[in-house]
């Protein structure tokens, strides 16, 4: 009877069988990882569309340190249809590939003071999958599925549900991110007064974003003139201006379109005009050139290592990839990009005013060497946008917020500008993928935006200044961006270690002296009683001599007791290389996490160009 009832329940409730716990997503090892303790991470698929076999893949890293608050940063790449593994392994993640087999640490990783969550979306992107007849078409469809993903992710990892949440990304993610933010705010309104927790969405970061097609399409020629790519007034320029006038007319009649073919022709023609010796301009980094059939699609060069690494069988297994997905990882999915062509969803620029007026902080940043999502277009969309009682960066009618010079480790890094919850950062000498070129500067920008305060944990600050002023929150903590600060930390650790060794040696020497004196006293008494005494170093005693015991302590034969050390000095020791396994005060070990999760489970029974 009992077995029949159990079988019936399992049949009626397949979720009892299929429900996963966090332990099922734990990454036990990562091929090619640097020596030492592995960073704490989870990865795998979460189902978001059961009817169409829709699953989103995520890769999550726990923060290495906690400053003044718990934070989670969600990172999305663009496309549409380009994998966020670009961000994980080439931009803001803790690892970079030295070759297709070896990982190295990224000095500017964003996981220093925030949990990092990379998501391949929409379905069909990267390691995510769905039935081939069920790719998404609209931005509101995408955001709805992302909410389903987050609901399940927070069920699996409830310890992060109260974190300050930031959503970051680049390029076509400039469409995704505002839509997801709006969906989160609507979800929070719907759960008010219920026992369900609201999500503490604090800010958005969009780099070289495809946000406003009107301004971005119309920025191609002005940017090309500004950078000397095309000579203004030339025959070539006039030919391109004809195409741009057609684009402008289409924009006026199709204001709610995210993508327009007539405007894409401007970029295609511009790239064709730059061909020399079978090489054309790299549209993602104008300092570089590429083959005429690619014009930047072969960039970054790290892709040569990322693709074979993510297609390795041992890596796929380590990341808990569904073995039924046999297509293998590709950076950008043409099928997803072709299907995702919003006709009903207005461009995300129309959502920004409402998000800013709700109190949400938004940061738009632009690498100055990107053509396809260049800073001229971003600056123009800001100038034209109205929010919070003003237009653009107005502080009062006719008065604009000043631009502040940003320097990093003594070198000009860019400019900052802020008004009414919106921050703009122009970053010098950076491409379409700012963190790829300048990881440490990008981390400094993130820490400023999140108001990271490391005063409670110490560490040496990065030399980062706004108009020459260094603010406390620009420090980068125990895993410093500054090379000089890192060397100082190593010297401090070495000095503290030597002090500890010296103290332990002094303590042992004192024990030896006391032992010798006591032994001598007994020998003296023995000689007085027995005249046949043979001496201290008799061969029968050689195996347990005090000197050998002392030698054993020096060579690790036995540990010096804790009382021999100054515990305060030892507690102060910290190095990212030596203590990378420590993440938070009072945190349980990975094994404890897994066993607890098993216990809890038992108790509960884009277009023609990729905007990557």
UniProtKB/Swiss-Prot annotation:
Biased composition (Polar residues): 472-485, 597-612
Biased composition (Acidic residues): 561-570
Signal peptide limits: 1-19
GO terms classed as biological process: apoptotic process; proteolysis
Places the protein is found: Golgi apparatus, trans-Golgi network membrane
Recorded catalytic activity of this chain's protein: Preferential release of a C-terminal arginine or lysine residue
Segments on the Lumenal face: 20-503
Residues forming the catalytic site: 171, 370, 432
Parts of the chain on the Cytoplasmic side: 525-612
Keywords, ordered alphabetically: Apoptosis, Carboxypeptidase, Glycoprotein, Golgi apparatus, Hydrolase, Membrane, Protease, Signal, Transmembrane, Transmembrane helix
GO cellular component: membrane; trans-Golgi network
Regions of compositional bias (Basic and acidic residues) in chain numbering: 571-585
Record keyword Hydrolase present: yes
Presence of the UniProt keyword GTP-binding in the record: no
Annotated EC: 3.4.16.6
GO molecular function, one term: serine-type carboxypeptidase activity
Region Disordered, annotated ranges: 460-489, 557-612
Lineage top rank: taxon: Eukaryota
Mode of membrane association: Single-pass type I membrane protein
Glycosylation sites per record: 100, 421, 429, 481
Function: Protease with a carboxypeptidase B-like function involved in the C-terminal processing of the lysine and arginine residues from protein precursors. Promotes cell fusion and is involved in the programmed cell death.
Family: Belongs to the peptidase S10 family.
Protein name, per record: Pheromone-processing carboxypeptidase kex1
Gene name, Swiss-Prot/TrEMBL: kex1
């Amino acid at each position: 009877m009992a077995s029949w009832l159990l079988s019936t329940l399992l049949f009626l409730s397949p979720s009892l069988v299929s429900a996963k716990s966090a332990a099922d997503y734990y990454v036990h090892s990562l091929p090619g990882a640097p020596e030492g303790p592995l960073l704490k991470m989870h990865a795998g698929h979460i189902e978001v569309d059961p009817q169409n076999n829709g699953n989103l893949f995520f890769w999550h890293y726990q923060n290495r340190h906690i400053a003044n608050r718990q934070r989670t940063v969600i990172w999305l790449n663009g496309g549409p249809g380009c994998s966020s593994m670009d961000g994980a392994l080439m931009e803001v993640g803790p690892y970079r590939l030295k070759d297709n087999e070896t990982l190295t640490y990224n000095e500017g990783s964003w996981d220093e003071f925030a949990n990092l969550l990379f998501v391949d979306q929409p379905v069909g992107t990267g390691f995510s999958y769905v039935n081939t007849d069920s790719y998404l078409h609209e931005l509101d469809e995408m955001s709805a599925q992302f909410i389903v993903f987050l609901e399940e992710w927070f069920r699996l990892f409830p310890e992060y549900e109260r974190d300050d949440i930031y959503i970051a990304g680049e390029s076509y993610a400039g469409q995704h991110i505002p839509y997801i933010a709006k969906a989160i705010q609507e979800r929070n309104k719907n759960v008010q007064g219920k026992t369900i927790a609201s999500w503490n969405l604090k800010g958005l970061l969009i780099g070289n974003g495809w946000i406003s097609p009107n301004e971005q399409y119309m920025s191609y020629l002005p940017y090309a003139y500004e950078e000397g790519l095309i000579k203004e007034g030339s025959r070539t320029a006039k030919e391109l201006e004809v195409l741009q006038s057609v684009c402008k007319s289409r924009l006026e009649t199709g204001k709610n379109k995210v993508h327009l073919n007539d405007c894409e022709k401007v970029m295609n023609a511009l790239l064709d005009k730059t061909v020399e010796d079978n090489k054309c301009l790299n549209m993602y980094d104008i300092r570089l050139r590429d083959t005429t059939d690619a014009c930047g699609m072969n960039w970054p060069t790290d892709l040569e290592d990322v693709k074979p690494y993510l297609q390795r069988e041992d890596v796929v297994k380590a990341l808990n990839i569904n073995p039924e997905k046999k297509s293998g990882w590709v950076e950008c999915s043409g099928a997803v990009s072709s299907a995702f062509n919003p006709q009903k969803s207005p461009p995300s620029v129309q959502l920004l005013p409402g998000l800013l007026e709700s109190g949400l902080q938004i940061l738009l940043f632009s690498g100055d060497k990107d053509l396809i999502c260049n800073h001229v277009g971003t600056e123009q969309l800001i100038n034209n946008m109205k929010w919070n009682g003003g237009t653009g960066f107005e502080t009062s009618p006719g008065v604009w917020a000043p631009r502040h010079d940003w320097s990093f480790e003594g070198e000009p890094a860019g400019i900052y500008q802020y008004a009414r919850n919106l921050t703009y950062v122009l970053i010098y000498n950076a491409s379409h993928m700012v963190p790829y070129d300048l990881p440490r500067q990008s981390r400094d920008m993130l820490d400023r935006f999140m108001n990271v305060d490391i005063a409670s944990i110490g560490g040496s600050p990065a030399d980062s200044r706004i108009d020459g002023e260094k603010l406390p929150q620009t420090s980068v903590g125990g895993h410093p961006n500054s090379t000089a600060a890192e060397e100082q930390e190593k010297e401090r650790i070495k000095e503290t270690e030597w002090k500890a060794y010296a103290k332990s040696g002094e303590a042992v020497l004192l024990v030896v002296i006391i032992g010798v004196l006591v032994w001598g006293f007994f020998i003296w008494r023995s000689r007085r009683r027995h005249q046949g005494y043979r001496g201290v170093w008799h061969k029968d005693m050689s195996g347990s001599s005090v000197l050998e015991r002392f030698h054993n302590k020096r060579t690790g034969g036995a540990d010096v007791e804790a009382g021999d050390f100054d515990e305060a000095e030892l507690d102060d020791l910290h190095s990212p290389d030596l203590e990378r396994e420590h993440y938070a005060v009072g945190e349980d070990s990975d094994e404890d996490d897994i066993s607890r999760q098993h216990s809890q489970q038992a108790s509960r029974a884009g277009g023609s160009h990729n905007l990557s």
